[in-house]
Amino acid sequence: MAIQSDSLSSLPDSPRIVAPQPVSPNEESIERALRPKALEEYVGQQRAREQLEIFIAAARKRGEALDHVLLFGPPGLGKTTLAHIIAHEMGVQLRQTSGPVLERPGDLAALLTNLERNDVLFIDEIHRLSPVVEEILYPALEDFQIDILIGEGPAARSVKLDLQPFTLVGATTRAGMLTNPLRDRFGIVSRLEFYNTDELARIVTRSASLLNADITADGAHEVARRSRGTPRIANRLLRRVRDYAQVKSHGVIDQDAAGRALAMLDVDPQGLDVMDRKLLEAIVHKFDGGPVGVDSLAAAIGEERDTIEDVIEPYLIQHGYLQRTPRGRTATLTTWRHLGLTPPAAASGGTGELFSK
């Protein structure tokens, strides 16, 4: 059973269908319904899954709390799901919150003092904990104790409270922003990687079954290959493709129906959407492939600088469509090919690694 305190995510102002973050509160509730409950149901992340199977089995045999767990990686890959699975496999409750919600030491103390033996406390966006709250967390993680201040002024005194043994599961998309003292207190650290197409197809097939949607193997594969390696995106695209199939394809999601539905949604075979293509086309057509500064690029496409840096660019850089250089953003040969264009002779002939395969 999970006990959740406050909303765990700040929703984007302009949701994209290929956004890796949740785009609505309703989507979060659907995710909970589709979430696997046990490690044997969890698809992908083989290394992390195998490690957790061993560590959980050992902790249960000893009757101890699992060591503290840090999960990091891009959004939408299953960090929250793994936290729930850990609690389920340990047979304990999960209490769920997020770094920005814990504004004062008392907020964290209230959670910690209400934990039962071996419970799991899940803190999403743990890199956003305030320093004063983080200080309270250190003795709780090491010694299962916290110090609280009673009274005010000269009469104030510190009281040490014992806590039940518990497991902290921290999740972050920015492991580099964690302080060293906090990072060092996690005994189990797992990085979640993007999923391959076969793994996503298995997830899509499972989700379709739970949604009572009729899907073929090639239909699941078509949804999977456009999902940018991210289960959250795969499940979102599946729901939209299901709607299309019910109206246009007699309810059956095959490769043709999935392809037509995703084309209607402007998600191309590589998973790029309108915003991705708008940025790449601006670099190629307006700036001759770059380099171009991010402020000039923002003005050219009518988007905020932060939107480009935080929302659009990461996927394009990770998958080789775009490079950041000291002089600005530059389109790679992959971009020119994707847009069906021939790169300038100077670009294709003398740019070294930018245009090498």
From Swiss-Prot:
Q: Where in this protein does the record put region Large ATPase domain (RuvB-L)?
A: 13-195
Pfam families, alphabetically?
A: AAA_lid_4, RuvB_C, RuvB_N
> GO CC annotations?
cytoplasm; Holliday junction resolvase complex
Q: Which GO terms describe its molecular function?
A: ATP binding; ATP hydrolysis activity; four-way junction DNA binding; four-way junction helicase activity
Q: Identify the stretch(es) annotated as Small ATPAse domain (RuvB-S).
A: 196-266
Which reaction equation describes what this protein catalyses?
A: ATP + H2O = ADP + phosphate + H(+)
- Enzyme's top EC category: hydrolase
Give start-end positions of Low complexity composition bias.
1-15
Annotated DNA binding lies at 305, 324, 329
One Gene Ontology term from the biological process aspect of the record: DNA repair
Q: Which UniProt keywords apply?
A: ATP-binding, Cytoplasm, DNA damage, DNA recombination, DNA repair, DNA-binding, Hydrolase, Nucleotide-binding
Annotated binding of Mg(2+), by residue: 80
**HAMAP family given for it?**
DNA_HJ_migration_RuvB (MF_00016)
**What role is this protein assigned?**
The RuvA-RuvB-RuvC complex processes Holliday junction (HJ) DNA during genetic recombination and DNA repair, while the RuvA-RuvB complex plays an important role in the rescue of blocked DNA replication forks via replication fork reversal (RFR). RuvA specifically binds to HJ cruciform DNA, conferring on it an open structure. The RuvB hexamer acts as an ATP-dependent pump, pulling dsDNA into and through the RuvAB complex. RuvB forms 2 homohexamers on either side of HJ DNA bound by 1 or 2 RuvA tetramers; 4 subunits per hexamer contact DNA at a time.
Whom does it interact with, and what assembly results? Homohexamer. Forms an RuvA(8)-RuvB(12)-Holliday junction (HJ) complex. HJ DNA is sandwiched between 2 RuvA tetramers; dsDNA enters through RuvA and exits via RuvB. An RuvB hexamer assembles on each DNA strand where it exits the tetramer. Each RuvB hexamer is contacted by two RuvA subunits (via domain III) on 2 adjacent RuvB subunits; this complex drives branch migration. In the full resolvosome a probable DNA-RuvA(4)-RuvB(12)-RuvC(2) complex forms which resolves the HJ.
**Family, per entry:** Belongs to the RuvB family.
Q: What is the designated name of this protein?
A: Holliday junction branch migration complex subunit RuvB
**Source organism of this protein record:** Bordetella pertussis (strain Tohama I / ATCC BAA-589 / NCTC 13251)
Name of the gene this protein is made from: ruvB
